[in-house]
Amino acid sequence: MTTYKEINGTDIEVVASDPSNPLVGEVWYNTTTQKLKGYRQVIGNAWSTGGNMGTKRFNGGGAGTQTAALAFGGFTEPASTVNTEKYDGSTWTEVNNMNTARREFASNGTQTSALGYGGQTPPGDRVAVTESWNGTSWTEVADLNLARRQLAGAGVSNTSALAFGGETPAAGQVGNTEVWNGSSWTEVNNLNSNRNNLAGLGTATSALGVGGDPGTSANTQNWNGTSWFEVNDLNTGRNGASAAGTTAAGLVFGGTSTVKTALTETWNGSQWSETNDMNTARNQMGGAGTQTAALGFGGEPPPTGTTTEEWNAGITVGAWVTGGSLNTARNYIAGTGTQTAALAFG
């Protein structure tokens, strides 16, 4: 039977107090507590509080990563805003404003290359306006073919985007889908079902449209660059949710089910799984990041908030569970066996 020394090259260390910074897999005997201990890896997923935004808002745009995000536009009560802020992982800083104040628009991109399109301007007009962010300022570019609000978007920069779904006064909920190539929008195949208030994630050639209205839908559709096809539904239907990630590794959080929710679900390319909730239930917040490192900011609890939450999924380090003490304290011992049938000698 293989011993600890044969695996690690050393005997089990005997100490009076636990190491302050043990290595993963390290084992030691604490003579003070008379406990044999070790260190292991624990998989953990959790939301934590980030820095507050300077301007409270909901129905705004979001782009970027957890440590380099952009928040822009939205509704600040009692009016829409042009305010733009960037996030460095701890603090929000105001930068140059958008040209057109609006809410309920779609967005995508990074902190230095973002796009905002569609939405609603006072006193309730649906717009097709598209603005491009270059890391310093906003510039108006070519309009959407269909003016609408409450649409979703996907894309990695201000030169590549997908706009889908939404609502117009004439048609109500729509399934219209348009692709942005950096200079113009082109109409392509529609969603399989007309929806508004849905969440979007992914790229212009590989995207997900998730949830939305009518009702509080759980429907999920996948865009393959040519057409939409239905995939497995969310576990909890909702509208007004936020999203991050890709079609292979996605994240949806918040929104409204029967009430505003903190529920978070992960997507593995084929199905949704529930995971740990946000700290604050809310909808219509900005979102950014990836499945393992996401950001949710602003939103409507109510009242409208400035709160930022950071999602981290990965490996954290924690202590092993302590077992029973040896009958005789000793050092330089050998051991063999299994966790439930072990032998210590020498």
Annotated model-derived regions:
Residues 1-346:
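Polar, enzyme-active/binding microenvironments
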